[in-house]
């Protein structure tokens, strides 16, 4: 009896400890999604209530229970055109590329960036580091969608979630016809699809807009896109998925180049935590349903579409930063007067992913020394290699400032290598803002680069410590 009582008491203690951890988790979720799964009040403003979607495209999101505990959230998404599209995609550079990355890259190469009908996506399982079986599973997802479209070899595949686990493939493929039947072109259809690709995201990321091209001023073109990502985000793509669709008639011969240009200046210019995922994919589909002249290289239409796509991709990428796990601030890092764009990007990237800079921002601490430190080591050679000269950074020419987003004057922290007498009260006011900019002037050239990042809060640890539980 004593042994039984001891066992019961032990179980009660464990239950009590678990309850305490759960309550602490609930109380700590100030910025990430509440345990209830609702969108935090501060993030609701980023979720559109209407949209303008490209002709000929439809979307859906359904729940199939990729994760057994998920019985309500959509976790399989379809986005497709009613006609074949020109298509391009940019993928992760991580050497452990997930099966859907390998599959989709191979398909685009085989099809010459033409004849793609749609994209099928699952969340909840990354299908990464899953061997030959994982690649077969990606193919089965594509085949199930192809059969719905009445096509063959026409579907790109994306997956996101936990690495190293096989997909419940029969559960997914048997429900893809249901996802196809649920497709529609309304705002609600697109928004549900955007929800289906989310993992630790606190809100669905969806943008749409219309635009015009010089050769067809009377034609209204449309572009829409969804993305996901909140952690494991760093350039060269990260746990970041993006699907962009347009009804403009963009040639398959130029689509890869315009997408790469746009991604380099948007998705590859954000960082949450410096980790690059196995699954990153941003795909662009153009079906030409709106008509007009085909967009080809070396034309005003090409330049105009490039600008539209880059601006659009930048706005999508910024939503990822705003949803950084546990983030309380959206921070623009701008490096100007650099000797080269490469140097500017490297320095901006280093500052943006510095844990010391990010925690200081969370703590509202104007510790500019951390910014300067990151600037100083950003171009230094790796340990074991000869020490390199770094003419791109000259201490006595370097300036650092906080730029408030409320229109007030910049706060200079370092001027030509000399520290300013910082007004701590003014610095605190700037660091209270949800949006702010760090400006670094190098004084060694005329090139520049911009990165977007967020702060690190206690919540980042909570989310990632609990990720698989």
Swiss-Prot record:
One of its GO terms (biological process) is ornithine biosynthetic process. One of its GO terms (cellular component) is mitochondrial matrix. Signal peptide: none annotated. One of its GO terms (molecular function) is glutamate N-acetyltransferase activity. The active site is at residue 239. Its EC number is 2.3.1.35, 2.3.1.1. The alpha and beta chains are autoproteolytically processed from a single precursor protein within the mitochondrion. The keyword tRNA processing does not apply. It is an enzyme of class 2 (transferase). It catalyses: N(2)-acetyl-L-ornithine + L-glutamate = N-acetyl-L-glutamate + L-ornithine; L-glutamate + acetyl-CoA = N-acetyl-L-glutamate + CoA + H(+). Substrate binds at residues 199, 228, 239, 325, 464, 469. The record marks 160-161 as: Involved in the stabilization of negative charge on the oxyanion by the formation of the oxyanion hole. Pathway: Amino-acid biosynthesis; L-arginine biosynthesis; L-ornithine and N-acetyl-L-glutamate from L-glutamate and N(2)-acetyl-L-ornithine (cyclic): step 1/1; Amino-acid biosynthesis; L-arginine biosynthesis; N(2)-acetyl-L-ornithine from L-glutamate: step 1/4. InterPro entries: Arg_biosynth_ArgJ, ArgJ-like_dom_sf, ArgJ_beta_C. It is found in: Mitochondrion matrix. Keywords: Acyltransferase, Amino-acid biosynthesis, Arginine biosynthesis, Autocatalytic cleavage, Mitochondrion, Multifunctional enzyme, Transferase. The record marks 238-239 as: Cleavage. Heterodimer of an alpha and a beta chain. This protein may be expected to contain an N-terminal transit peptide but none has been predicted. Belongs to the ArgJ family. Catalyzes two activities which are involved in the cyclic version of arginine biosynthesis: the synthesis of acetylglutamate from glutamate and acetyl-CoA, and of ornithine by transacetylation between acetylornithine and glutamate. This is Arginine biosynthesis bifunctional protein ArgJ, mitochondrial.
């Amino acid at each position: 009896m004593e042994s039984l009582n001891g066992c019961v008491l032990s179980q009660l203690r464990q239950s009590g400890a678990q309850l305490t951890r759960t309550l602490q988790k609930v109380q700590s979720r100030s910025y990430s999604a509440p345990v209830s799964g609702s969108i935090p009040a501060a993030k609701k403003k980023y979720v559109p209530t209407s949209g303008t979607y490209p002709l000929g495209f439809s979307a859906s999101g359904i729940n199939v229970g990729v994760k057994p505990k998920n019985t309500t959230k959509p976790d399989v998404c379809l986005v497709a055109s009613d006609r074949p599209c020109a298509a391009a995609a940019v993928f992760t550079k991580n050497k452990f590329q997930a099966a859907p990355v390998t599959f989709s890259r191979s398909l685009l190469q085989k099809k010459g960036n033409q004849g793609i009908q749609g994209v099928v996506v699952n969340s909840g399982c990354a299908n990464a580091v899953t061997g030959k079986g994982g690649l077969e599973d990606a193919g089965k997802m594509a085949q199930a969608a192809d059969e719905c479209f009445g096509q063959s070899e026409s579907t790109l595949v994306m997956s996101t979630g936990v690495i190293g686990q096989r997909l419940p493939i029969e559960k997914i493929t048997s429900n893809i016809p249901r996802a196809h039947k649920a497709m529609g072109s309304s705002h609600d259809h697109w928004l549900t699809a955007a929800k289906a690709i989310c993992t630790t995201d606190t809100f669905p990321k969806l943008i749409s807009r219309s635009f015009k091209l010089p050769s067809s001023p009377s034609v209204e073109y449309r572009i829409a896109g969804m993305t996901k990502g909140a952690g494991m985000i760093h350039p060269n793509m990260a746990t970041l998925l993006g699907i962009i669709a347009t009804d403009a008639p963009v040639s398959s011969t130029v689509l890869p180049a315009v997408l790469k240009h746009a991604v380099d200046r948007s998705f590859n210019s954000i960082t949450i935590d410096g980790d690059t995922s196995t699954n990153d994919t941003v795909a662009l589909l153009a079906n030409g349903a709106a008509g007009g002249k085909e967009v080809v290289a070396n034309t005003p239409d090409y330049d105009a579409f490039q600008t539209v796509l880059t601006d659009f991709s930048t706005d999508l990428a910024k939503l990822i930063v705003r949803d950084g796990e546990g983030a309380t601030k959206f921070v623009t890092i701008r490096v100007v007067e650099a000797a080269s764009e490469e140097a500017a990007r490297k320095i901006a990237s280093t500052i943006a992913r510095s844990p010391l800079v990010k925690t200081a921002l969370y703590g509202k601490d104007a510790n500019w020394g951390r910014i300067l430190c990151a600037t100083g080591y950003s171009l230094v050679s790796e340990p074991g290699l000869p020490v390199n000269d770094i003419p791109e950074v000259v201490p006595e020419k370097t300036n650092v400032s906080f730029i408030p987003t409320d229109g007030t004057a910049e706060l200079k922290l370092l001027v030509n290598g000399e520290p300013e007498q910082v007004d701590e009260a003014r610095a605190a006011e700037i660091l209270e803002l949800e949006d702010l900019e760090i400006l670094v002037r190098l004084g060694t050239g005329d090139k520049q680069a911009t990165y977007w990042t967020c702060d690190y809060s206690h919540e980042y640890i909570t989310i990632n410590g609990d990720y698989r539980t």
